[in-house]
Design a protein with these regions (language model features):
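Conserved hydrophobic/aromatic pocket- or pore-lining residues that grip, position, or stack substrates
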Residues: 3, 262, 306, 388, ...
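Active-site-proximal cap/loop segments of hydrolase catalytic domains
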Residues: 57-63, 68, 563-768
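Secondary-structure transition/capping motifs at alpha-helix termini
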Residues: 265-270, 333-335, 365-368, 376-383, ...
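N-terminal cap/lid segment of alpha/beta-hydrolase-fold proteins
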Residues: 498-539
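Short beta-strand element of the alpha/beta-hydrolase
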Residues: 531, 539-550
Length: 768
């Protein structure tokens, strides 16, 4: 259990000036008492009623602040028993704010970077519903203004009173209806179901925006209370881009689909311009987008120019159109009509503005899985987009990386650019594993120059680029025998910044290697093989096979190696701990399903069988695995895989399926990458569903599921009904339901019990 609960390497956040870093320690598995806190499940959101924040929002228990120039520590007085959100830096990097979650609410704190002095803002209670921590570019409870003194915060409204009580007598029946218009939707969880649910959602999600003067601690209300999805100052800070949900709500869709008003305000909350009054998005095509404006933002390097995207195909990816989306812009004072800046042939997937009026735009073709990076000129409406990169989304070897950004004085993130050159940073996937890199790339010539790449045999991840040339980096270095630590790299020169001790000396001697092979039809595959410490060559061990299937358009991309498991430090995740109990572990086993994206699942079972057969054959050929003592296990779609392998093969002696979906007729509008509905491809849904073959599962299977699963499609009833089907047909099966746990298990006691259950199961059926 010591290895299971060993602390992970701290995460890092670098200041906007790139001169300080905060190393943030997370608890790998918090206590079950955290997981079991009271919550409401409303509109697809899990709300902690004690804190008025997100239930089980990630938190840090400590920060360590370092000056990057000399590595000196800055002592900071943080709250006792802290549960801190991520730091939110002022644009000058002299201060950072953070929330601290207490049993009674979310506090707001601020620290001075150079001195470590901290203060709590008394009387400020943050509303953490509909937010994701902090930082510009995403929903946040905290937004710094460029004066580095003022913040916009979302507060629990003062004097709002107690939460609405469930009426003792129902007001009437709960009614839903649809009047003949198609509206397919995934099987979302945690939706609204009654008028009382609506009242509770309004109560907890409603926030009061306010300006907070960090010098005095005084708050000034901004506008009226509302359910805000967005508040973002313009670069010149004369305007605020806001989004606000309103009724009528849906009982079939989560909050992100509710009606929404997108407006520009002045600094006093007076509406200046309405971008869109979006209706309920209840008729969005499968894999489509809602019509009307979306992806709205400010253009980073302009004073106050809006940009947003609109679909030209009705949001339907099946429509044949010359252009699928258009990008519009509108400058203050927002008079006249918006300008159509550019059109893209495929679905818009993101934009980063450059410093010359141009922008990098990504679009994605659903039919071919091709993702492109385009250069467009926002200052020349109607000009043709120029293709910079184009590749299959699964083609990791050709991934050019992402543009590196830095923080401007306005607090906005912008692409680092010197003339025509930008910096790109990526995973660097290769046949030997990931080798992260930084490139200097010329947009005019299309030529790149490699500035840095992680050496083979180890793993050096790029955590931050510390200068505009890309030569000074903050990296995290590790190897199978080297504990992860942070370094400052300046070209070839390395300076160690942290000295974290080995948290898991128990893993010393565990061997691991990347293994490459092919399946029967020639598709290249791989897995990472773990062998116990002291393993003697030629000894055949009982083995555990852990995998998760993915879909690919072609064999070349299906066979690519991704990840850095074989080069990284051997800390071991929970599913890998069998190697400490005498098992060989075949980890991250390739399970590709290859074919046309529209019909790839027609041969799902056949390909899955070939994948598993090839992996076992290779391990047996190497002389390390006993063919007659192999177990298979996986989580979510990996659990689905496990049940299918036990239903359709005799390759395994036992299986463990965590939080799976086994009857695909209960996810009738598509699942994973399946694009067809049940009514279009009922035979495929049936053939892929192990529930329909429960009578064939005679290999012992342990099924585990969180009672509060929140993942689309994997309702707990999937495991409950699968257990009943196998039991009813005379199979050997055990069902373990985990109280309070969601799709991904979090609680310390939960993880210890899961490990106990799985090791006992495999020991019983795989060991002599």
């Amino acid at each position: 259990m010591d290895v299971l609960n060993a602390p992970p390497t701290p995460a890092v956040s670098v200041s906007p000036q790139r001169d300080y870093a905060i190393f943030m320690q997370v608890v790998r598995y918090p206590p079950i008492s955290d997981v079991a806190q009271p919550m409401l499940r409303l509109a697809g959101i899990r709300i902690d009623t004690n804190t008025n924040g997100m239930h089980m929002a990630p938190y840090y228990i400590s920060y360590a602040v370092k000056r990057l120039a000399d590595g000196d520590d800055v002592k900071v007085a943080f709250p006792q028993d802290a549960k801190m959100g991520p730091p939110v830096w002022s644009s000058d990097g002299k201060r950072f704010a953070f929330t601290n979650t207490t049993p009674h609410g979310m506090e707001l704190w601020m620290a001075t970077t150079a001195t470590g002095q901290t203060r709590r803002f008394d009387g400020v209670v943050v509303n953490g519903v509909l937010t994701s921590g902090g930082g510009r570019g995403g929903p946040s409870s905290i937004e710094w203004m460029a004066d580095n003194r003022t913040m916009i915060v979302r507060l629990v409204p003062a004097g709002r009173g107690a939460a609405p009580l469930l009426p003792a007598i129902p007001a009437g029946p709960h009614v839903q209806e649809s009047l003949g218009h198609a509206g397919p939707a995934p099987t979302y969880e945690d939706l609204l179901g009654t008028p009382h649910d609506e009242d509770l959602f309004d109560y907890y999600a409603t926030a009061q925006l306010a300006y907070l003067d960090t010098s005095t601690g005084k708050t000034t209300p901004l506008g009226t209370p509302g359910i805000y999805t967005l508040v973002r100052p313009s670069p010149d800070e004369k305007h605020l881009l806001t989004g606000r949900l309103h009724h009528p709500y849906s009982y079939q869709l989560p909050a992100g689909s509710f009606p929404q008003e997108i407006q520009v305000w002045d600094r006093s909350a007076k509406a200046e311009y309405t971008i869109a009054s979006l209706p309920l998005a209840d008729r969005v095509p499968i894999a489509g987008v809602r019509t009307g404006p979306r992806s709205y933002d400010w253009i980073t390097r302009k004073a106050a120019t809006l940009t947003w995207v609109e679909a030209l195909d009705g949001g339907n990816p099946l429509e044949k159109v010359p252009y699928r989306d258009r990008i519009l812009s509108h400058a203050a004072p927002f008079q006249g009509e918006p300008v159509e800046a550019a059109k893209v042939k495929e679905r818009f997937a993101g934009m980063q503005t450059l410093d010359n009026g141009k922008a990098l735009v990504e679009d994605y073709d659903r039919a071919s899985r091709i993702v492109r990076t385009l250069e467009i000129d926002l200052d020349k409406p109607g000009s043709e987009a120029r293709v910079i990169f184009s590749r299959n989304e699964r083609d990791a070897y050709r991934d050019p990386g992402s543009a590196v950004t830095k923080t401007l004085a306005t607090g906005r993130r912008a692409v680092i650019q010197t003339g025509d050159e930008i910096l790109l940073s990526g995973a660097g996937s290769s046949p030997t594993g990931d080798r992260p890199f930084v490139d200097r790339f010329n947009l005019a010539t299309g030529k790149g120059e490699r500035v840095f790449q992680s050496e083979a045999g180890g793993y050096e991840a790029i955590e931050a680029v510390l200068d505009d040339s890309g030569t000074r980096l903050l990296t995290r270095r590790e190897s199978p025998v080297e504990t992860p630590n942070y370094f400052i790299r300046n070209g070839a020169e390395l300076k160690q910044l942290t000295h974290f001790a080995n948290p898991v000396p128990q893993t010393a001697g565990v061997k691991k290697q990347l293994v490459n092979y092919k399946r029967a039809d020639g598709v290249p595959l791989s897995f990472t093989l773990y062998l116990p410490a002291g393993y003697k060559a030629g000894t055949r061990l009982p083995a555990l096979l852990w995998a998760y299937p993915y879909e690919f358009s072609d064999a070349d991309t299906a066979g690519q190696v991704t990840g850095h498991e074989s080069q990284s430090f051997t800390q071991l995740n929970y599913h890998q701990l069998g190697v400490l109990q005498g098992y060989a572990l075949m980890d991250n086993v390739s399970m590709p399903i290859v074919g046309d994206p529209d019909t790839v699942n027609n041969t799902y079972v056949e390909q899955l069988r070939m994948d598993a057969q090839a992996a076992i054959d290779k391990a047996v050929e190497m002389g390390v695995v006993d063919r007659d003592r192999v177990g298979v296990f996986g989580h979510s779609y990996g659990a689905f895989m496990t049940a299918n392998l036990l239903a359709h093969t005799t390759l395994f002696r036992a299986g463990v399926a965590e939080s799976g979906a086994y009857n695909r007729t209960l996810t009738p509008f598509g699942f994973q990458s399946e694009r067809r509905t049940f009514w279009q491809a009922g035979d495929v849904y049936t053939k892929m569903s192990p529930f329909w073959f429960a009578d064939k599962i005679k290999t012992p299977i342990l099924m585990i599921h969180g009672e509060a699963d929140d993942n689309t499609g994997t309702f707990p009833i999937q495991s409950e009904r699968m257990y009943a089907a196998i039991r009813g047909n005379g199979g050997t099966v055990r069902l373990v339901m985990l109280p309070s746990e969601a799709h991904g298990y979090r609680g310390k006691e939960t993880m210890e019990h899961v490990l106990y259950e799985e090791m006992n199961w495999f020991d019983k059926y795989l060991k002599p």
